[in-house]
Amino acid sequence: MNARSTGQHPARYPGAAAGEPTLDSWQEAPHNRWAFARLGELLPTAAVSRRDPATPAEPVVRLDALATRLPDLEQRLEETCTDAFLVLRGSEVLAEYYRAGFAPDDRHLLMSVSKSLCGTVVGALIDEGRIDPAQPVTEYVPELAGSVYDGPSVLQVLDMQISIDYNEDYVDPASEVQTHDRSAGWRTRRDGDPADTYEFLTTLRGDGGTGEFQYCSANTDVLAWIVERVTGLRYVEALSTYLWAKLDADRDATITVDQTGFGFANGGVSCTARDLARVGRMMLDGGVAPGGRVVSQGWVESVLAGGSREAMTDEGFTSAFPEGSYTRQWWCTGNERGNVSGIGIHGQNLWLDPRTDSVIVKLSSWPDPDTRHWHGLQSGILLDVSRALDAV
């Protein structure tokens, strides 16, 4: 017997309403749990090639190694909407967790952990002498003359020390970050929106101030534009050449692209938890990956040493880490362990623990993008796992 057509497409995931999620709802709960793992089904993406053939996946290592000291770890991971969690100590995967329906070879959206990857590519080009961090941005991208980026140096962009008229309120439809999203194809376009990310960046203004921290996602896309200009490559190709192809990654990463093909460097990368851990491993190994050196030892040391504490103005971060700072697209806790992290909204973390030579990856789908409540729970898990590793 033939099934009668309903005139609707099948639901994208169990329980989803017909047509959901849309461009305007995929970042919201409950849709984000599906979308963060299946972004290529919603948005145009490009592959960040690993170059060599993929290697067979290793079996999953459970949480047993941490169970004695952290018996409630799995419960805490579930309570914080964790999709993937991994602890890499040296070259050994010590513990892993994947929620039901999420596999070790599934990619997950990194959100602003993507910024730390971009900062690493810029570091590689600085090491090569192709970017001078002291030079003004417009030396590389003259199209930004007349914008807020006309005057500040590349290093000030890296460290997010530019005063800019940019509201990073992810739920405010009138905010610049939502206009940024729409220009990049992450939300439904509106009349009058810039045609693409390049054009959006040229519209940004500010008071000309520098030297004080202001978190702004546009800064990372400016860095990606500089990368394109000095290499002659699309950002997605540069990310592959200077980072991903050297990691011995299990899978290609992906990055969302706008209608011009510009990769959304500030938040659009997706990869597996295991491959993200390889980025952290490279950093703790002094910038060296299986495929060769990515960045210099000096670059890594600059990141691990942290940035200007005097410049840091983010009260949410300093309430948890009073000595915290931001440098080269990484968050630096300034705590006694020297923890450094790439952080993304909705619960994405690439956490480095130099004391135990360990990397912790936590990929999540919080219902809220960015609140002290969720960050407090997340930081508590990461710190407790780091301390537990002292005795493992």
From Swiss-Prot:
Keywords: Hydrolase, Nylon degradation, Plasmid. The active site is at S112. Its EC number is 3.5.1.46. It is an enzyme of class 3 (hydrolase). Pathway: Xenobiotic degradation; nylon-6 oligomer degradation. It catalyses: [N-(6-aminohexanoyl)](n) + H2O = [N-(6-aminohexanoyl)](n-1) + 6-aminohexanoate; N-(6-aminohexanoyl)-6-aminohexanoate + H2O = 2 6-aminohexanoate. It holds the Pfam family Beta-lactamase. The keyword Protease does not apply. One of its GO terms (molecular function) is 6-aminohexanoate-dimer hydrolase activity. Residues 1-22 are annotated as: Disordered. Involved in nylon oligomer degradation. The EII enzyme is 100 times more active toward the substrate than the EII' enzyme. This is 6-aminohexanoate-dimer hydrolase. The gene is nylB.
